[in-house]
Structures are given as structure tokens and as C-alpha cells.
């Protein structure tokens, strides 16, 4: 038996061959994931991780990002990982790679070239993910890499997202 603790205990029973069975959908840990810098490695990490179907048996991922950018990355990486577009984290579907579309703005993707536009997209994703986490929509928040210089704006004056989250949540 494998037990994972985070807000609640989740048990994965094993069969005779000692292989994990799929947990009940309601038992899966919900993981909110900020997209990070749209010109960085965030989507590559996320999409490649969840292209393994076994990962979707362990958790319910919820990306906070940009659907068009995610699809661009999928196509560029040659991945067929389907995305389940949802309006809010509470609508996440177990067994799917869920994405909450944080913006309908057109975003130009240039790999390895962070800019103010990709920094603002990273901030919007992080802000919406943090708000949903604070409201209890999911169990764990994972942040994809950001450009610490390009994410800076009037609302984000921190060294990085760790400091932003510390300021936002304090000792929670």
C-alpha cells in the first residue's frame, strides 16, 4: 500500500501481482501547475510529464496557462497529450490533463527568449493558480520556471515566485 499525505491520506491498494490499481477519481491529489514563462521550458516539462498515462493515475493535474500556447508547445514537441479545457480548477476531470485558460490574448512564443509579454503571462498564471489554491480548489501548487527579470511588474516586485508566494500566503 502506498500512502501519500497532503491535506488528506490517499491509499492505492495493490493486487496479487503487487502493481498499483487506479485510485478512485475522488481520491486523487489535485495539483495546480502554473505555466511559467511561455518562452521557457515550463510547458515542455508539464506536457512530457503527463504524456505518461501512469501519471494521470496518481494525480489530477490542473495547468493554469494559455490554451493556444500549450497547443503550440504540444505541436512543436510532437506530443499528442490531449488537454481538457476547463473554466475553473473545481471543474477538473480525473484522468485528464486539465487546463484553465488564464488569457485569450495573443502571445508570441520564441523559445529561449523571455520578454515582458512572456513574463506577464507567467505572472497571470501564477496569480490565478495562487488564488485558486487559496480558495481550496486543489491540494498542491507546483510552479514552472519563470524569468525573474521579465515577470516584474507593478503587482510583482519580488526576487522570484517563492518570495511572491511567501508574501501571499505568509505561514499558511
Where are these regions (language model features)?
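Active-site neighborhood for divalent-cation/phosphate handling
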Residues: 172
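Contiguous, glycine/small-aliphatic-enriched amphipathic segments in soluble metabolic enzymes
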Residues: 2-169
Amino acid at each position: 500500500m502506498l500512502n501519500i499525505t497532503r491535506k488528506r491520506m490517499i491509499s492505492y491498494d495493490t493486487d496479487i501481482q503487487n502493481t498499483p490499481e487506479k485510485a478512485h477519481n475522488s481520491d486523487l491529489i489535485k495539483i495546480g501547475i502554473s505555466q511559467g514563462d511561455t518562452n521557457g521550458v515550463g510547458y515542455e516539462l508539464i506536457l512530457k510529464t503527463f504524456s505518461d498515462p501512469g501519471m494521470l493515475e496518481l494525480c489530477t493535474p490542473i495547468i493554469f496557462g494559455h490554451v493556444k500556447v500549450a497547443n503550440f508547445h504540444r505541436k512543436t514537441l510532437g506530443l499528442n497529450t490531449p488537454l481538457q479545457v476547463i473554466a475553473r480548477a473545481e471543474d477538473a476531470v480525473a484522468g485528464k490533463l486539465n487546463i484553465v485558460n488564464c488569457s485569450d490574448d495573443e502571445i508570441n512564443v520564441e523559445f529561449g527568449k523571455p520578454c515582458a509579454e512572456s513574463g506577464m503571462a507567467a505572472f497571470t498564471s501564477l496569480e490565478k493558480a495562487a488564488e485558486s489554491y487559496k480558495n481550496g480548489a486543489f491540494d498542491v501548487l507546483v510552479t514552472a520556471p519563470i524569468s525573474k527579470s521579465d515577470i516584474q511588474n507593478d503587482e510583482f516586485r519580488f526576487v522570484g515566485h517563492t518570495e511572491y508566494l511567501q508574501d501571499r500566503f505568509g505561514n499558511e
